[in-house]
Design a protein with these regions (language model features):
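N-terminal Sec-pathway targeting helices
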Residues: 2-17
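Acidic, serine/threonine-rich low-complexity disordered tracts
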Residues: 23-140, 178-269
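Beta-strand/loop-rich accessory regions of lumenal/periplasmic or secreted enzymes
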Residues: 170-177
């Protein structure tokens, strides 16, 4: 019985990691075409209206149910926090936390104003009785990612080098929001530290969720790893994420609130 219980907890932990990876992959605005790469790599942050970029969605909160079939296993919560200073510049700050039975995964994400390219991520994973801390630092000029993992008193460091800007985690929907028009057939490439995917907008559908009914853009990945639904309005809210395979773990939006730039919340359905 104890062995079976351990296997179930391990399966749930792997599922959450998989869902988090899917969430990261989905929203990349890095098309295969070279002009998209140039747009991200050559952008001058000093020329952007940083104040507007930093404050537009401050206070936003999205709550998701984590499901396997019709069973709810726990929840994930995304928060857009007040901008902070990092290395002498004002940057975006966001958090993403997943909680299941005896498992939690907390992330604090710092990203550049305007581009939303990740600069620093602090992560804490609790898989009872074990605790792991992960620090990620991104050099978007040299296209490198330095990862330091700490368990107890033991730390290990890994450096990943890529051929272009590196994206990560929950910040990617904000890049998608800046695309003026989306049409069926539109595609983008996901350039993650460990793997690349192509994401294609396959259809426009009506989606019924615990948070309400939405018209949604339906994206599918190639290779076939996941499906994603994003609201078909100016907010481009990530509504639902479904992983492929026999486990069928899914993130489904339960609640959405939009802040007033000062962190106070208003229901924006």
């Amino acid at each position: 019985m104890l062995s079976k219980k351990k296997n179930i907890l391990l399966s749930l932990s792997l599922a959450v990691v998989f869902i988090s990876v899917v969430y990261i992959i989905v929203f990349l605005n890095l098309k295969p075409a070279q002009n998209q790469l140039v747009l991200v790599r050559d952008i001058d942050l000093e020329e952007l209206d940083n104040r507007e970029a930093l404050n537009k969605y401050t206070g936003e909160k999205i709550v998701y149910n984590v499901r396997m079939g019709n069973v709810t296993l726990g929840k994930s919560v995304f928060n857009r926090l007040q901008p902070v200073e990092l290395d002498g510049k004002m940057v975006n700050l966001m958090s993403f936390e997943t909680r299941l039975a005896r498992f939690s995964d907390k992330e604090k994400i710092y990203s550049a104003a305007g581009t939303f390219l990740p600069l620093k991520i602090e992560r804490e994973i609790s898989n009872w009785p074990f605790l792991e801390k992960i620090s990620e630092r991104y050099d978007q000029d040299k296209f490198t990612l330095t990862i330091i993992k700490t368990k107890g008193k033991v730390s290990e460091e890994r450096v990943i080098r890529k051929d272009g800007p590196i994206h990560n985690s929950i910040i990617l929907p904000f890049v998608l929001r800046d695309i003026p028009e989306l049409a069926v057939g539109w595609s983008m490439a996901a350039n993650l530290p460990g793997q690349k995917f192509e994401i294609k907008l396959s259809s426009l559908k009506t989606l019924k969720l615990p948070a309400g009914e939405f018209k949604a853009y339906h994206f599918e990945s190639n290779p076939s790893k996941f499906e994603i639904w994003v609201s078909a309005d100016e907010r481009r809210i990530p509504l639902k994420i479904k992983g492929a395979g026999p486990l069928g773990y899914t993130l489904v939006m339960k609640e959405y609130k939009l802040g007033n730039n000062n962190g106070s919340m208003v229901d924006s359905r």
